[in-house]
């Protein structure tokens, strides 16, 4: 099944082949459609850079985050506002068309997940994997690289850390590595990093 995005070259299919093992759901289908277009155009890296820049803008602006997440705004209002942001940020081409199509389809609320899924597809293409890490305070360089090395040893791949700071968590460190279970040896390494973080605090 193709979504209404065909006019911009964006076709969202129900089945995405090997990508199904990496991403899933509606956001995964959108991300895969964009990834396929970017691959064909030789623009995988530039599209990722544009999406990362837009994600940073959303993270920095409460108003923009509300626009993306709130169902109160109409598709027309979201499209007009997000288009202005894209133009101001100099985001055009595939990434710009993609975000506009997402807004027109009333799927802007899922944009952060789509961006994350696109990053996962890019990482898989490069032989990398992405770990979602939640910490109560920013990681020091030493803790960042200790965690990165521990996860790399566990997966046998270069690991990209997607770090989120959430002061409300009490465990010191939460790591999500796709659907893989954290084994005992890695848990021991993570615990040592947790204890080190607590000592610094």
Curated annotation (Swiss-Prot):
It comes from Xanthobacter autotrophicus (strain ATCC BAA-1158 / Py2). F(1)F(0) ATP synthase produces ATP from ADP in the presence of a proton or sodium gradient. F-type ATPases consist of two structural domains, F(1) containing the extramembraneous catalytic core and F(0) containing the membrane proton channel, linked together by a central stalk and a peripheral stalk. During catalysis, ATP synthesis in the catalytic domain of F(1) is coupled via a rotary mechanism of the central stalk subunits to proton translocation. This is ATP synthase subunit delta. The keyword Transport applies. HAMAP family: ATP_synth_delta_bact. Belongs to the ATPase delta chain family. InterPro entries: ATP_synth_OSCP/delta_N_sf (IPR026015), ATPase_OSCP/d_CS (IPR020781), ATPase_OSCP/dsu (IPR000711). GO terms for molecular function: proton-transporting ATP synthase activity, rotational mechanism. Keywords: ATP synthesis, Cell inner membrane, Cell membrane, CF(1), Hydrogen ion transport, Ion transport, Membrane, Transport. F-type ATPases have 2 components, F(1) - the catalytic core - and F(0) - the membrane proton channel. F(1) has five subunits: alpha(3), beta(3), gamma(1), delta(1), epsilon(1). F(0) has three main subunits: a(1), b(2) and c(10-14). The alpha and beta chains form an alternating ring which encloses part of the gamma chain. F(1) is attached to F(0) by a central stalk formed by the gamma and epsilon chains, while a peripheral stalk is formed by the delta and b chains. One of its GO terms (cellular component) is plasma membrane. It is a peripheral membrane protein. It is found in: Cell inner membrane.
């Amino acid at each position: 099944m193709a979504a209404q995005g065909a006019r911009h070259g964006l076709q969202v299919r129900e089945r995405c082949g090997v990508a199904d093992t990496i991403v899933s759901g509606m956001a995964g289908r959108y991300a895969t459609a964009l990834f396929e277009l970017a691959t064909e155009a030789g623009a995988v890296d530039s599209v990722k850079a544009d999406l990362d820049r837009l994600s940073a803008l959303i993270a920095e602006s409460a108003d923009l985050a509300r626009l993306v997440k709130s169902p109160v705004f109409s598709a027309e209002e979201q499209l007009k506002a997000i288009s202005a942001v894209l133009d101001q940020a100099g985001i055009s081409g595939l990434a710009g068309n993609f975000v506009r199509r997402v807004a027109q389809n009333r799927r802007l609320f899922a944009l952060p997940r789509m961006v994350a899924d696109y990053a996962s597809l890019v990482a898989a293409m490069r032989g990398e994997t992405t770990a979602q890490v939640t910490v109560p305070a920013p990681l020091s360089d030493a803790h960042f690289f200790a965690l990165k090395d521990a996860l790399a040893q566990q997966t046998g791949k270069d690991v990209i850390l997607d770090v989120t700071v959430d002061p409300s968590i009490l465990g010191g460190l939460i790591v999500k590595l796709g659907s893989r279970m954290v084994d005992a040896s890695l848990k021991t390494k993570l615990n040592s990093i947790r204890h080190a973080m607590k000592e610094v605090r």
